[in-house]
Amino acid sequence: MTEEKRKAYEQATAALDAYLKAQSQKYQDPARHCSLDFTCPLPSVGRISTYFGEPDAVYNKPHTGADMPAASGTLIYAVAEGVVSAASARPSYGNCVQIDHGTADAGSSYATLYAHMSSFCVSAGQTVHKGDVIGYVGNTGDVRGANGGYHLHLELRINGTRTDPLQYIPH
């Protein structure tokens, strides 16, 4: 990868993180409780194509989530109750949705991000329940190399920090 592409990737990632943080702050409610009783975001997961922390084939950076291959248009479900804090198209993540799930008993806040959707069917500020359809599997945004093809890119952020979603979310 050229230095120019690396810088562009890092700038896009920083812009996305700033956007998601600002959106979370708009919709965070300290009174919202997160039970940590998550469900699978897809009807079924046959395999994980890229795990959290694995080197990205294109940018050679640690992968920020878990990639779950699925057929185009497969339903994507909210893994838990929460409020949609972002639903938009982003250059690298394509059509994506972030849901703020609230604060767990230990005081940590939880949010999930669903990326590369063909489309989403929720909007910022909307309350969703565990298992609600929030969108459909796609390949929008920057989906090349081993991460290409139709898949759900799922991230879990605890207190704003990316964390391995497979440690918390059934798959």
Predicted regions and their residues:
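Alpha-helical oligomerization segments with coiled-coil/rod-like character
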Residues: 1-35
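Zn2+-dependent peptidoglycan hydrolase active-site motif and core
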Residues: 61-63, 78-121, 145-152
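Short, well-structured beta-strand-loop connectors
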Residues: 75-84, 122-137
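A residue-level detector for short acidic-glycine micro-motifs
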Residues: 50, 70, 86, 116-119, ...
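Short glycine/threonine/proline-enriched tight-turn/helix- or strand-capping micro-motif at secondary-structure
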Residues: 29-30, 47-81, 100-101, 158
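Conserved, short, structured surface segments that act as functional micro-motifs
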Residues: 95-98, 126-171
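Glycine-aromatic-enriched surface loops/turns that form tight recognition elements
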Residues: 37, 41-43
